[in-house]
Amino acid sequence: MALRAPWIALCCVLAVLFVVPAATRDEERQKRGVDFGLQRGFSGSELAKLKLALARAQDPHGPGRKRRDAYEMERQKRGVDFGLQRGFSGSELAKLKLALARAQDPHGPGRKRRDAYEMERQKRGVDFGLQRGFSGSELAKLKLALARAQDPHGPGRK
């Protein structure tokens, strides 16, 4: 017990020595107002970055804000814009026109083609592929699969 008392007293004295000056510094900082960190050791470049960030935040045309200029207003009124005013090259314009032509093509990509054979097959129902040119082995596999499916003692049946 005798050794603990001096240590506790030393800790209390050190705490008082460190806490009191820190508290007075905070009070002085609050009295001064806005602090850009010059007292904390910010460099001049860091201060300049902070000022630029403040200026950007107050800019009405800053990031995240929509700009409305004369060109944009006119483009909204016109509708489709092929980019001639923005300086698209001839090849870019040709690509855009080709893409529009493909999109309007009734037999373009993603559209189902219906010919006479498909229409007839849909009317008939099951087709074993003889008209499409299935080989004998493919036809045999299909017939075996049908036979297994109709077997009363086949897989999945008790």
Curated annotation (Swiss-Prot):
Residue span of region Disordered: 101-120
Additional detail: Is also classified in the limacoditoxin-8 (DH31) family.
Signal peptide boundaries: 1-24
UniProt-annotated stretches for the region 3 X 46 AA tandem repeats: 33-158
Molecular function GO labels: diuretic hormone activity; G protein-coupled receptor binding; toxin activity
Family assignment from sequence similarity: Belongs to the diuretic hormone class 2 family.
Name of the protein this chain belongs to: U-limacoditoxin(8)-Dv66
GO terms (BP aspect): body fluid secretion
Sequence repeats: 33-78, 79-124, 125-158
Entry annotated with the keyword Zinc-finger: no
Organism field: Doratifera vulnerans
Modified residues (Proline amide): 63, 109, 155
Function: Probable toxin. Does not show insecticidal, antimicrobial and antiparasitic activities. Does not induce increase in intracellular calcium in mouse DRG neurons, suggesting that it does not induce pain.
Propeptide: 25-32, 64-78, 110-124
One GO CC annotation: extracellular space
Subcellular location: Secreted
Keyword terms of this UniProt record: Amidation, Cleavage on pair of basic residues, Repeat, Secreted, Signal, Toxin
InterPro entries per record: DH2-like (IPR034439)
Tissues expressing the protein: Expressed by the venom secretory cell of the spine. The spine is a cuticular structure containing a single large nucleated venom-secreting cell at its base. It is an independent unit capable of producing, storing and injecting venom. On the back of D.vulnerans caterpillars, spines are grouped together by 50 to 100 to form scoli, of which there are eight in D.vulnerans.
